[in-house]
Swiss-Prot record:
Record-level GO BP terms: photosynthesis
UniProt record similarity statement: Belongs to the PsaE family.
Name of the gene this protein is made from: psaE
Keyword Cell membrane: no
Subcellular location: Cellular thylakoid membrane
Any single Gene Ontology cellular-component annotation: plasma membrane-derived thylakoid membrane
Keyword Lyase listed: no
Protein name: Photosystem I reaction center subunit IV
Domain of life of the source: Bacteria
Task performed by this protein: Stabilizes the interaction between PsaC and the PSI core, assists the docking of the ferredoxin to PSI and interacts with ferredoxin-NADP oxidoreductase.
Length: 69
C-alpha cells in the first residue's frame, strides 16, 4: 500500500533523530523530489529554530524510509 497524507508512519532512516519513532504524514510532494514526504512529530528535535529553545517537529523523508505504523 502507498503512503498517504494523514497516515501514521514509522521512520526507518537510521541516521534520523526520529529513527523508529512514529509520526503523521502532513503532505506528499508529487513533483519527483527525493525527500517528498513531510512527517510531523509530537516531540521536538534537539535543534533550536530562529534563536528559540524549541526544535523542529517536522522533517522530510523519502517514501522508502517510511513504513505504515
Amino acid at each position: 500500500m502507498a503512503i498517504a497524507r494523514g497516515d501514521f508512519v514509522r521512520i526507518k532512516r537510521p541516521e534520523s533523530y526520529w529513527y523508529n519513532e512514529i509520526g503523521k504524514v502532513a503532505s506528499i510532494d508529487k513533483t519527483g523530489i527525493k525527500y517528498n514526504c513531510t512527517v510531523r512529530f509530537d516531540k521536538c528535535n534537539y535543534a533550536g529554530i530562529s534563536g528559540t529553545a524549541e526544535g523542529a517537529t517536522t522533517n522530510m523523508f523519502a517514501e522508502s524510509e517510511l513504513e505504515k505504523a
